[in-house]
Amino acid sequence: TTLFRSLISCLYLSVGAQTPQPIKQFLRKPYMEGASFSLIVKEVNSGETVFAYDTIRQLTPASVMKTVTTATALEILGEDYRFPTTLEYDGSIENGLLKGNLYIKGSGDPSLGSAHFAPDHKRFLQEWISALKKVGIHKIQGAVIADESIFDTEGTSLKWVGEDMGSYYGAGSYGICVFDNLYKLGLQTGAPGTRPKLKGTEPELSGIHFHNYLTTQQVSSDSSFIVGAPFATDRYLYGIVPANREWYPLKGDIPDPTLFLADYLTRQLEHEGITVGESPSCFRILREAGRWQPGKRTEIVTTYSPTLREIVEVTNHVSHNLFADALIKTIGLRYTP
């Protein structure tokens, strides 16, 4: 980082000048052997090129493109923009019984429950439960339904490589996201050459079937993959993990974060003594079954995300793929015909 800052500080010289010493030092580093390097720096207001180095070389921009996405989001949405997630109901409340369904209305917020905003990232759950009790709901006749209809169901691109499907860094972006759309799978590993035991997930996932093809070796870190398609309940585990660990975590993507949140909230409600009569569901499932019924709903409480400025800071600092995908989809909504 220090070298990079020194490099940038030396760039305010004419384009025709010799290559600055910091760049020469950078290019002589062992990790740059065989690598390609290109750089251009422009003055923001005038557009004048301050420094250029091998600018005709074609390079893959990779996550540098996140800066374009986040800058565009700040320009269009504004740095104080916040994503709303609303708890709503239809039907009526009679003597503590909700004669209808409870809805989670999403707006594409990628930061709901995100660990990057700890320690208060799970506070929204208690806020929702408290709000339900405040309006007098102690029993739900219908179901908890997540409404992710603001975005389509293509949370991941069909052009992504197969090994990214199921990985935490390849988590899909949907109208409702939660907990960074990732889970941790705990492993208990034994002697080298053995298969590790699966110790459950955090958060707890319902209905997921893991096919375990992992093996242990005497290594310090894993080289493994969790592979699986969006919405699919099967996940395949491949690769190697360190031997003799009482608990070793692997991270994967929540296959259907929208349905997961409906299920998760249902379990939290029942833990708090608020019973739910029907199984959790979501817009995608109900629409495919021809049972989606749009209609009038009553707002109970709205949870707002951190500011866009804060979300952008996380996006660029940790190179958060999910956040970037959600931002570009949100920008696109502003230009939907």
Where are these regions (language model features)?
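Short glycine-rich, polar/acidic loop-and-turn segments at beta strand-coil junctions
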Residues: E43-N45, S63, L74, G108
